[in-house]
UniProtKB/Swiss-Prot annotation:
It catalyses: N-acetyl-L-glutamate + ATP = N-acetyl-L-glutamyl 5-phosphate + ADP. Catalyzes the ATP-dependent phosphorylation of N-acetyl-L-glutamate. The gene is argB. This is Acetylglutamate kinase. Belongs to the acetylglutamate kinase family. ArgB subfamily.
Length: 293
């Protein structure tokens, strides 16, 4: 008997979705997935809630998610309140000492705790960290140092995360880390996520972005490339098909894959529940780049 409150097709669809997800849940149980959380998914409350629920569900079915986050819009908001003009060069925030103070305050003290609190409310048992905690990430100056306190990853110490993951916690990591002299640097969150994924021997690296994925034609969302081999991703950069802001994201994926990560995904964070759709469905919604077979 069908209840008047339920449509048979709706119930059938729910069963279909759960059935499709089952083999992926079984496959990834106990595996590590590093998620870079940023973009529109951090700004809009509905998307933020969907990401938190996705992460909590991943943890509840045995996946071990690790979250790395940025926080550009929030940083810009506080710089404006403090009358500090943000400056960008080559797509990177030029970071002097005053700006670095704000970056560290916002990412470590504000954004990180908002994410931790959101996950904890859903029972995900999140723990907030920065790259500096336990020397998790050691920074070095990016390029020739002309961008100030903008950093790159010198090395990663995954031992800090192992006991947390083994005990069922969800590490939430801000992309601020100190160099060997103890000076804090602002590191691109994609870069931190990629290097952590490699160090943790993660099954997947997932970058939440404000684009559908890698497009063959940047003006056409319909030209989304759903799956690539590592060599094909490199060729797209060489051919100029991947360009602009997508280049560092694709390069981040390539580096992680070259170090042993099984697959890297560039996913549209503007789509609610993008994480679950990419991980637990056959079609996915973004671009998956596969490592060496």
């Amino acid at each position: 008997m069908v209840s008047p409150d339920h449509e048979p097709m709706d119930d059938a669809l729910r069963v279909s979705v759960l059935s499709e997800a089952l083999p992926y849940i079984q496959r990834f149980a106990g595996r590590r997935i590093v998620v870079k959380y940023g973009g529109a998914a951090m700004v809009h409350a509905e998307l933020q809630s969907a990401v938190f629920r996705d992460l909590a569900l991943l943890r509840s079915v045995g996946v071990q998610p690790v979250v790395v986050h940025g926080g550009g819009p929030e940083i810009n908001h506080w710089l404006k309140r403090l009358d500090i003009d943000p400056e960008f060069r080559e797509g990177l925030r030029v970071t002097d000492a005053a700006t670095m103070d704000v970056v560290e305050m916002v990412l470590v003290g504000r954004v990180n705790k908002q994410i931790v609190n959101g996950l904890n409310r859903l029972g995900a048992r999140a723990v907030g960290l920065s790259g500096s905690d336990g020397c998790l990430v050691e920074a070095r100056a990016w390029g020739d140092g002309s961008h100030g306190l903008v950093g790159d990853v010198a090395r990663v110490n995954p031992d800090v995360l192992e006991p947390l993951l083994d005990r069922g916690y969800v590490p939430v990591i801000s992309s601020v880390a100190a160099n060997a002299e103890g000076v804090a640097h602002n590191i691109n969150a994609d870069t931190v996520a990629g290097e952590l994924a490699a160090a943790l021997e993660a099954e997947k690296l997932i970058l939440l972005t404000d684009t559908p994925g890698i497009l063959r034609d940047r003006e056409s969302p319909e030209s989304l490339i759903r799956q690539l081999k590592l060599s094909e991703a490199r060729q797209l950069i060489d051919d100029g098909i991947v360009a602009g802001g997508m280049t560092p994201k694709t390069e981040c994926c390539i580096r992680a894959l070259a170090q042993g990560v099984s697959a890297a995904h560039i996913v549209d964070g503007r789509v609610a529940h993008a994480l679950l759709l990419e991980v637990f469905t056959d079609a996915g919604i973004g671009t998956m780049v596969l490592g060496r077979s």
